[in-house]
């Protein structure tokens, strides 16, 4: 049973998708630069407003250079980061009895997506693989830099502009 889906994609009006690059790792965090209309002062003069930059939760779907394929799913941006840490191993298959039962149930074949991971990773013996563990060890991961960029939403550039405006 095949079903067609319609999904909104492409640029959004009044804004532009941008990517903020990491400084420590080869990462790109999707952001949206939203253009603002000018403020009209009490005397009728227009004051231009700087664009506002926010984290873009739309994923690659609003990137005009990305081809959407719902059956393939989203790009697995963390996959290489995890592999590069070399503290996990990839299993040969699903490890839970429930997961294996679902995988072997042919009546569910019509519901499956080709991108579903059937070879999950687990920590190597003696290793811990949580972001909290890495942080306590003083290790900064690509995930941490990604979140820092996402949450700061270019606040450093805003501070710089404010200081310049104030003559500091």
Task: For the regions a language model picked out, list residue spans one by one.
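Non-catalytic terminal accessory/regulatory regions of metabolic enzymes
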Residues: 1-168
């Amino acid at each position: 049973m095949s079903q067609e889906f319609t999904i909104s994609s492409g640029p959004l009006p009044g804004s532009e998708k941008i990517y903020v690059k990491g400084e420590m790792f080869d990462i790109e965090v999707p952001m949206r630069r939203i253009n603002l209309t000018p403020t009209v002062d009490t005397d009728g003069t227009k004051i231009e407003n700087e664009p506002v930059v926010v984290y873009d939760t739309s994923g690659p779907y609003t990137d005009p250079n990305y081809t959407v394929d719902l059956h393939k799913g989203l790009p697995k941006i963390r996959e290489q980061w995890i592999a590069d840490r070399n503290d996990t191993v990839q299993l040969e298959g699903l490890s839970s009895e429930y997961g294996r039962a679902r995988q072997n149930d042919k009546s569910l074949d019509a519901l499956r997506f080709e991108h579903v991971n059937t070879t999950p990773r687990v920590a190597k013996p003696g290793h811990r693989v949580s972001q909290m563990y890495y942080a306590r060890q003083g290790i900064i991961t690509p995930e941490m830099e990604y979140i820092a960029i996402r949450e700061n939403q270019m606040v450093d550039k805003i501070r710089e502009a404010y200081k310049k405006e104030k003559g500091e």
